[in-house]
């Protein structure tokens, strides 16, 4: 999921369709918060964004990614710091969106500015919030499914490209959860 979103973002940047890529992700995983991690903001968010970096490095040379990060052409923007922004001429990705709250999701979605595209990526089976009912991804998919210019793509175990065994694992969990 993340790889596909990053591929589209990189292609859009390289084709001149956008001026910038903005990458965001909830900074809370399994109850941990950024404030408890050592370092400055970049050092705190980097571990959370590792899957996005991995995808970027597969599509662009390392030095090119680093240069675009340094020049803010690729921006890392923790969701906690998005309030008040309008993101224009950007390709915006929200990864691990299942771990946003309803309030965070609404705030994030309303950052969309002119000539921007937004891709929200998540998996409703991997919610780390205390209550799965609080997931902004689930809430948004219910509220926005019939709005023109907003689309949803759902993937399942047939779409897994990591390893054939991963598909079998997902299938086993899906069968176990349906019983």
Protein language model regions, located:
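Conserved helicase motor core of SF1/SF2 NTP-dependent helicases
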Residues: 2-94, 98-179
């Amino acid at each position: 999921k993340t790889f596909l979103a990053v591929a589209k973002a990189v292609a859009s940047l390289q084709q001149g369709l956008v001026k910038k890529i903005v990458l965001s992700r909830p900074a809370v995983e399994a109850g941990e918060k950024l404030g408890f991690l050592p370092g400055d903001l970049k050092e705190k968010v980097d571990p959370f964004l590792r899957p996005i970096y991995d995808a970027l490095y597969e599509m662009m040379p390392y030095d090119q990614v680093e240069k675009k990060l340094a020049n803010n052409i690729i921006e890392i923007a923790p969701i906690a710091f998005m309030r008040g922004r309008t993101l224009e001429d950007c390709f915006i990705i929200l990864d691990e969106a299942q771990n946003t709250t309803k309030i965070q999701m609404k705030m994030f979605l309303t950052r969309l500015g002119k000539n921007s595209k937004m891709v929200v990526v998540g998996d409703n089976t991997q919610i780390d919030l205390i209550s799965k009912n609080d997931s902004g991804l689930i809430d948004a998919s219910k509220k926005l499914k019939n709005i023109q210019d907003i689309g949803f793509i759902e993937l399942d175990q047939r779409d897994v490209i990591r390893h054939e065994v991963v598909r079998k694992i997902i299938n086993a969990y899906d069968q176990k959860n349906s019983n």
